[in-house]
Swiss-Prot record:
<feature type="domain" description="KA1">
    <location>
        <begin position="463"/>
        <end position="511"/>
    </location>
</feature>
<dbReference type="InterPro" id="IPR008271">
    <property type="entry name" value="Ser/Thr_kinase_AS"/>
</dbReference>
<dbReference type="InterPro" id="IPR015940">
    <property type="entry name" value="UBA"/>
</dbReference>
<dbReference type="GO" id="GO:0005737">
    <property type="term" value="C:cytoplasm"/>
</dbReference>
<keyword id="KW-0534">Nitrate assimilation</keyword>
<feature type="modified residue" description="Phosphothreonine; by GRIK1 or GRIK2">
    <location>
        <position position="176"/>
    </location>
</feature>
<feature type="binding site">
    <location>
        <begin position="26"/>
        <end position="34"/>
    </location>
    <ligand>
        <name>ATP</name>
    </ligand>
</feature>
<feature type="binding site">
    <location>
        <position position="49"/>
    </location>
    <ligand>
        <name>ATP</name>
    </ligand>
</feature>
<keyword id="KW-0150">Chloroplast</keyword>
<keyword id="KW-0444">Lipid biosynthesis</keyword>
<dbReference type="GO" id="GO:0050688">
    <property type="term" value="P:regulation of defense response to virus"/>
</dbReference>
<dbReference type="GO" id="GO:0106310">
    <property type="term" value="F:protein serine kinase activity"/>
</dbReference>
<feature type="active site" description="Proton acceptor">
    <location>
        <position position="143"/>
    </location>
</feature>
<dbReference type="GO" id="GO:0009507">
    <property type="term" value="C:chloroplast"/>
</dbReference>
<keyword id="KW-0963">Cytoplasm</keyword>
<keyword id="KW-0945">Host-virus interaction</keyword>
<dbReference type="InterPro" id="IPR011009">
    <property type="entry name" value="Kinase-like_dom_sf"/>
</dbReference>
């Protein structure tokens, strides 16, 4: 018998959650329940996930649960579900979340069928704003679908379920195949490496299609057939779509991730900009900057409820979870709901400061041309860690040239440097360099310098065992505007030798 599950309905839970009055069960999942509750001090409703540790462990879902908790703890956006606090016991984890009463976008589409373009656009604008916020804070969702998009009482989008999300690391690429196959990008189901944001763009394209058409672009009961359609980009556009929608959807559903439209480009698209609310017309404020903004009126309300003012202010500045900060954020969120939005003041400041309202983050030049070594420490998400702010520089080499032209020049440079390579994707290679070997000892096998489907590498047993062998990866992907970025990631080998190789590589390149 699961004794912890039996405690869900008795006074045991209330003793653990003295600040909440538990109500009815909203849903039952694989390893717990979701209950509606009332925050005693403020009277505001919340949803509380009660997760059973034993069930989570048996299903090997500890990492998924922990990941979602860490990510949501730091996020503050009107279209991302809010997490107020997490209370842990030896048997259960209690996650206090924002309560949304109107269910999933999936059910909304099933009930209403295809939506009018204005309504679909309103949903889509909110989704893109939330996804952009994730990406700016180095998180890729990887499982965007209507089932994970909730609706509040005013039918505003709330992005949820970050259990499959990954924190993006500069110079690193993801390979895990996850998410729902109907919404997954070709590179994901193919098991190829991907940078991250481009897979969310694909999923958003599928969602937009579903909003406007009432059906999925890629659907088949037979999974191999479904994968074939996705990998081939095989779908049809109904005739009822406007010309602008017919232009945007195919650009989001381009099979080649390098050529796929980006979030900043979606923002600039005419269909997206039509009837765009002012609070969504600018990029969202940085998470760290948000934490610095404290609403004095709300603080005073919290103090009037019996909390110490200095403790409230210190806890807010440090992003500490306690009764005072939970009370503050519940009051804040319920005071400023969309459409005014509790973030609108930050958006307004950005606009009034004279910046372009459609400004997107731009990467400045690095101190060494356009190249910076991609060996960067990982940003952790500890209890009081901060999500990194926007980058003011870019990793890798940037170019306006055509991707094939760039890769041909890259291969020429690698051959000149006597580097072996193996193609692992359309624009992705594993490389190996052993300093000091003569050309004949580190032989290349591709005499025709075209980026073809076949791999081009010869493994040398002696070279592979050399203590000075340098292993690295190259990947080209699309950056802002019409630029392409070549990322260089050291996998193994001495750091300074790798930097020497990169310097030599730069001098060999002809078009970048």
């Amino acid at each position: 018998m699961d004794h912890s599950s039996n405690r869900f309905g008795n006074n045991g839970v209330e003793s653990i959650l003295p600040n909440y009055k538990l109500g009815k069960t909203l849903g039952i999942g694989s390893f717990g329940k979701v209950k509606i509750a009332e925050h005693v001090v403020t009277g505001h409703k919340v949803a509380i996930k009660i997760l059973n540790r034993r069930k989570i462990k048996n299903m090997e879902m500890e990492e998924k649960v922990r990941r979602e908790i860490k990510i949501l703890r730091l996020f503050m956006h009107p279209h991302i579900i809010r997490q107020y606090e997490v209370i842990e016991t030896t048997s259960d984890i209690y996650v206090v979340m924002e309560y949304v009463k109107s269910g999933e976008l999936f059910d909304y589409i099933v009930e209403k069928g295809r939506l009018q373009e204005d309504e679909a656009r309103n949903f889509f604008q909110q989704i893109i704003s939330g996804v952009e916020y994730c990406h700016r804070n180095m998180v890729v969702h990887r499982d965007l679908k209507p089932e994970n998009l909730l609706l509040d009482s005013r039918c505003n989008i709330k992005i949820a379920d970050f259990g499959l999300s990954n924190v993006m690391r500069d110079g690193h690429f993801l390979k895990t195949s996850c998410g729902s196959p109907n919404y997954a990008a070709p590179e994901v189901i193919s098991g190829k490496l991907y940078a991250g944001p481009e897979v969310d763009v694909w999923s958003c394209g599928v969602i937009l299609y579903a909003l406007l058409c009432g059906t999925l672009p890629f659907d088949d009961e037979n999974i191999p057939n479904l994968f074939k359609k996705i990998k081939g980009g095989i779908y049809t556009l109904p005739s009822h779509l406007s010309s602008e929608a017919r232009d945007l959807i195919p650009r989001m559903l381009i099979v080649d991730p390098v050529k796929r439209i980006t979030i900043p480009e979606i923002r600039q698209h005419r269909w997206f900009q039509t009837h765009l609310p002012r609070y969504l017309a600018v990029s969202p404020p940085d998470t760290v900057e948000q934490a610095k903004k404290i609403n004095e009126e709300i603080v005073q309300e919290v103090v009037n409820m019996g909390f110490d003012r200095n403790q409230v202010l210190e806890s807010l500045r440090n992003r500490t979870q306690n009764d005072a900060t939970v009370t503050y954020y519940l009051l804040l969120d319920n005071r400023f709901r969309v459409p005014s939005g509790y973030l609108e003041s930050e958006f307004q400041e950005t606009t009034d400061s004279g910046s372009n309202p459609m400004r997107t983050p731009e990467a400045g030049a690095s101190p060494v041309g356009h190249w910076i070594p991609a060996h960067v420490d990982h940003y952790g998400l500890g209890a009081r860690s901060q999500v990194p702010v926007d980058r003011k520089w870019a990793l890798g080499l940037q170019s306006h040239a055509h991707p094939r032209e760039i890769m041909n020049e890259v291969l020429k440079a690698l051959q000149e440097l006597n580097v072996c390579w193996k193609k692992i994707g359309h624009y992705n290679m594993k490389c190996r360099w052993v300093p000091g070997l003569a050309d004949g000892q580190n032989t290349m096998v591709n005499n025709q310098l075209h980026f073809r489907d076949e791999s081009s590498i010869i493994e040398d047993d002696c070279a592979m065992t050399s203590p000075t062998v340098i292993k690295f990866e190259l990947q080209l992907y699309k950056a802002r505007e019409e630029k392409y970025l070549l990322d260089i990631q050291r996998v193994n080998g001495p750091q300074f030798l790798f930097l020497d190789l990169c310097a030599a590589f730069l001098t060999e390149l002809r078009v970048i």
